Design a protein with these regions (language model features):
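N-linked glycosylation sequons
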Residues: 1-193
Length: 193
């Protein structure tokens, strides 16, 4: 439909001006502002506004929120982006509201689960939401959160890197959906931002 979507940004934006310009929320704000009505605040506050979409950037320690579960159950779309805080978490496996179980630690150039150079993107599946999009030849990912292997991982994967590891995953929750970008929303882990 032509109506503007109400999109909520939930993140920690209590930073200096310089830090704000580098924050994932800054990138999301600039990308979304032309086509969406943006709401910002804490999770409980934005849920009261009944947004169409809630976006969280590198948030960890999400409470097991009945209000968020109910919002998803009624058709909400929760989009999460990974980042250094999530990668550093020792309780990543227990994090609620993710489409897949994540391995602790993430993977980056020079890290413990390392690859030698940044990875490009694999072609998008023809039946997925990114079908028909052209992948820039210089698009690379330097770090990501890895999904634990599971029998349904392939069907939850919307986009993957050239090595076959998931870049974007999705799972239904009630009438809603949870989507995870396994890399950051800013340029810290990828040049896709």
């Amino acid at each position: 439909s032509l109506r503007r979507r109400k999109v909520a940004l939930v993140g920690d934006d209590r930073a200096s001006e310089t830090q704000r310009l580098l924050s994932p929320l800054h990138y999301l704000r600039r990308a979304l502002a032309p086509g969406a009505d943006l709401i910002e605040g804490g999770l409980d506050d934005v849920l009261l506004a009944s947004p169409d979409v809630i976006i969280m950037a590198d948030r960890i320690g999400l409470p097991d929120s009945p209000a968020l579960a109910e919002w998803l159950d009624k058709g909400g779309l929760l989009v999460r982006f990974a980042g250094p805080r999530m990668a550093a978490s020792e309780r990543l496996r227990d994090e609620p509201f993710l489409p897949v179980v994540l391995r602790e630690g993430g993977r980056d150039i020079g890290g413990a689960l390392s690859w030698g150079e940044p990875r490009g993107l694999a072609p998008f599946p023809p039946e997925g939401p990114f079908a028909g999009l052209t992948i820039p030849t210089d698009a690379t990912v330097r770090a990501q959160l890895l999904a634990e292997p599971s029998p349904d991982l392939a069907q939850k994967t919307l986009a993957q890197l050239s090595d076959g590891t998931p870049l974007v995953t999705r799972a239904p929750m009630g009438q809603g959906q949870i989507v995870l970008f396994h890399t950051s929303a800013n340029a810290e882990w990828t040049n896709l931002a």
